[in-house]
Amino acid sequence: MKKRTLLPVLAMVLLGGCASPAMLATIDRADLESVRKAVKKEDKAVKPAFDALVSRAEKALEAEPLSIVNQTVTPPSGDKHDYMSMGPYWWPDPTKPDGLPYIRRDGEHNPEFYKMESRGWLEKTCNRVQDLSYAWYLTGEEKYASKAAELLRVFFIDPETRMNPNLTFGQSIPGRCTGRGIGLIDTYILGRTIDAFILLDGSASWTAKDKAALQDWIRTFYKWMLESEIGMDEGRQPNNHASAYDFQICAYAIYCGEPEVARRQLEQVTFGRMDIQFPADASQPLELKRTNSWGYSTANLNMWMGLVNIGDRLGIDLWSWKNKVGVSLKEVVEWYFPHILEGKPWFKKDLSKTRQPGNIDRIMRVYCRKFCPGRYPEFVEGIKKFTNSPKYDFDTSVYNLLYPVNG
């Protein structure tokens, strides 16, 4: 492993005096410090994941900044600063000459979905910024922070290139609507990138002006989520969209220095979602009825783990919550145990031919950190057998760096 100088702590002192580092949304800063020390010592426990992270960050250094104004489609507003995407499962109606209005085929992606660049460019920007920010924080190499800052300025800050802070035209459906509340699932990746934004605070490349500008964008966006009809419509959804909505509101509020908003969302809104989503058997019927029941149910529960992490930062123990039928998140996680520990076959044949293990990996990390750290290796072996997905490498996953399980 190449030797690297660890500079972020010194930079934070020089730039911010003795002020305490800003609160992270989903990551434990003490864990990051432990991982950073392990990286410095070339600890074999973190080396595969760290090397993979640096490799991705190096590739991100070569990436051209993406600007939403370069999208090939023009939103109904006529303003290419507006985000626009299409519902992935909507197809032309073969019984209609013009195919309109489109009809839904759950789980089947229409290739037209990929022709609208907004979503893909947002995801690429967020993923690159995550890799670059984490790499900077763990190595102290300013080149990573500098590139992350460049990508963020182009996508969110520069008036000439930035995205407008709304999703008015998210997940449109030809012949039906130009945008929907559930389009806000597209920005779940943005909520997951908040910690990467916060970690850049100690960098010389990310200025106070940059931070203020990005906070202003995020604040405007999440206020739009709370107050616009499209945003409120998403907030009324019962399923994974509600989980993603709450997670985003909480993460954005924390980034904007408004933890009381996150606290209010958790206590006054999120808790009630448990009554809707989790029946007495601790399953997730709203997700399990989908054509990709494994993917949707584990994705939704992973969103809840993000809410658990945020609750931890705010001193709110979501694990202790029980809904009106007495079900807790602990029981919802344990609903999967017969499958991942005992090899019980999945109850239905999904449209997807693979069971992605990434979501259940993070779920079990958060669960084991709370209840049984020593059992995590057992869960990993069970997940490997049940999902049978060789493309996912547990050893190189960034979760090893962000959510380490020490048992």
What annotation goes with each model-predicted range?
Residues G181, I185, I189, D210-W217, ...:
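Short, contiguous, pocket-lining structural segments
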Residues M1-L7:
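Bacterial N-terminal signal peptides that target proteins for export
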Residues V9-L10, Q71, L288:
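Exposed boundary/loop context
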Residues A244-F347:
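Long, repeat-rich segments with strong aromatic
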Residues C18-E234, E267, P279, I310-R313, ...:
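Extracellular glycan-targeting catalytic surfaces
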Residues P8-G17:
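Bacterial N-terminal signal peptides
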